[in-house]
Amino acid sequence: MFNLKTKQKEKKKEKLEDREKIRSIRFNILAVACIILFCAVLAPITLQNDTFYTIRIGEHILQNETIDMQDPFSWHENLPYTYPHWAYDVMIYLIYSVGGMAGIYISTCIFSSILGISIYKTNSKLVKNRVVSFVITIGAMYMLRDYIAARAQLVTFILFTLQIYLMEQLANTSKKRYGVGLILIGILIANLHVAVWPFMFILYLPYIAEYVITIIEEKTAKKFRKELKEGYKIVLTKRNGVKYLVIVMIICVLTGLVTPLGTTPYTYLVKTMQGNTTQ
């Protein structure tokens, strides 16, 4: 009799879990569909002046099959140029070659949608609440509406969002594949938008700070023989995966060399802040 009741309870529990999974899948499908529609609407139909320059730079690179570090469209002869987003320029030119300006607009809609889905996926992992994740995603995309354009920054937003997702996964699971993903993101940013490459390291700092604080707490508690108590508002948990995160961050410093731009990833930001990117 007892076994029968136990089996009935287990079956009810399984049914409830199955229903919850179905609800979750349905909500995610609906949420993703709404996000794609909303993000596509945010993409501007009119293109910026930079788009024409981007197309020609990409064409120039493919025609010459090299990056000569000189501006081919300047009035001045042999004017140095750093090609800060050469890979993006090539990609946009290839899209333009296939679909013209309409193709670039469609690609902007697609990138915008990918950004929205990436934010939703990352928030779902962090917040653990589908509705809150959806609301945050819509709000974030609305705030970013002025930056949704056929420019390298749109792809960079996607990569930074994916970086946060991979860092969370690596910190929680210590699985190597997430570290490999972070290294690939470092290489992509160095080639797609070199100006913001140094900023990817800033995203590592909160994890390192959290880890250091938890170590200090543990040592302090051990020294005074006290038990660690959870904070009322902020709870810091020591995650061993952060050690691997630090190793990956150090490796990512070398990703700036995996580019045809030489040492530009290490110097471009400083030169930009100094107001000189031609030396």
Protein language model regions, located:
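Short hydrophobic alpha-helices at membrane interfaces in multi-pass membrane enzymes
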Residues: 169-187, 243-244
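Specific aromatic-rich, kink-prone transmembrane helix
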Residues: 118, 143, 155-173, 204-216
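Transmembrane-helix motifs of polytopic, lipid-linked glycan transferases
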Residues: 106-126
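Transmembrane catalytic cores of multi-pass membrane glycosyltransferases
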Residues: 46, 50, 62-67, 194-279
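Short hydrophobic/aromatic helix or loop-helix immediately within or flanking a transmembrane segment
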Residues: 76-102, 106
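Short acidic/glycine- and proline-prone juxtamembrane loop motifs at membrane-interface regions
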Residues: 147-155
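Transmembrane-helix signature of polytopic, membrane-embedded enzymes
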Residues: 119-142
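Membrane-interface alpha helices of multi-pass inner-membrane proteins
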Residues: 140-144, 178-195, 254-255
